[in-house]
């Protein structure tokens, strides 16, 4: 393996991995299947809202149920596409580039022309009207993506850490003309679901949306001497909070049974 993303395992990362691992065990013991659909709606709403989609959770629910929604056509299409993309989780291999392209084609169907293929022009990560990261030149993208996937296939790193590192490196490369954020978050969920399937039903994206400014700040401050360490710490914190929130939701649902 020739490429290794730069990052450092800090005490904060170690503690968060231990905390999440313990919480996952408890979550399995008390898993509430009735919350799966609600969580999928929260996931779709969160991952799209991060990038400006204005549909409410109620409208996302209506789209899921096939009901008419009064909203911009492209935003409704984004919801339909994201629902289809997350339904592919069981069929995608997190270590295959072709599956990444398939997921992107699903996520961006009917929205842009360049679906399921790497970008041909420049790109960057934008927060509001501010460009916080200029991506590598387009001609480098296939090689950078292949290096990243080779690292993912061969790394011995804990899946919690590996998924966060992949997420950051993916956003750094920004391989597509559009839909990089949505696809990157989907792929982290995919990686985590191969470690613990319950991650398919955890609305991590909804908590990322809650801390949207911090999410983009973590991307912006990563890449220096510490590599993507700040981003890894941030996302692990989001996962830990997601599990805490889910436990509270589970207890409340039991009260109302």
Question: Predicted segments — roles?
Answer:
Residues 1-255:
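FIC/Doc superfamily catalytic core
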């Amino acid at each position: 393996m020739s490429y290794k993303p730069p990052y450092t395992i800090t005490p904060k990362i170690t503690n968060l991995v231990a905390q999440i691992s313990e919480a996952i065990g408890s979550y399995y013991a008390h898993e509430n299947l009735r919350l799966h659909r609600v969580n999928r709606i929260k996931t779709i709403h969160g991952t799209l809202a991060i990038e400006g989609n204005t549909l409410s959770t109620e409208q996302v629910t209506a789209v899921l149920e096939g009901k008419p929604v009064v909203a911009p056509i492209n935003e409704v299409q984004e919801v339909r596409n994201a629902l289809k993309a997350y339904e592919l989780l069981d069929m995608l291999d997190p270590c295959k580039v072709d599956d990444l392209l398939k997921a992107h084609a699903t996520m961006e169907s009917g929205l842009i022309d360049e679906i399921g293929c790497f970008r041909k022009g420049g790109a960057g990560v934008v927060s509001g009207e501010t460009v916080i990261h200029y991506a590598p030149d387009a001609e480098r993208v296939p090689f950078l993506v292949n290096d990243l996937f080779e690292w993912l296939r061969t790394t011995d790193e804990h899946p919690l850490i590996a998924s966060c590192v992949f997420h950051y490196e993916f956003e750094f490369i920004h391989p597509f003309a559009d839909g990089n954020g949505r696809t990157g978050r989907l792929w982290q969920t995919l990686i985590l679901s191969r470690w613990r399937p319950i991650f398919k039903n955890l609305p991590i994206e909804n908590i990322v949306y809650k801390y949207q400014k911090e999410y983009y700040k973590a991307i912006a401050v990563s890449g220096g001497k510490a590599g993507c360490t700040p981003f890894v710490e941030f996302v692990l914190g989001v996962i830990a909070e997601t599990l805490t929130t889910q436990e509270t939701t589970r207890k409340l649902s039991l009260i109302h049974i």
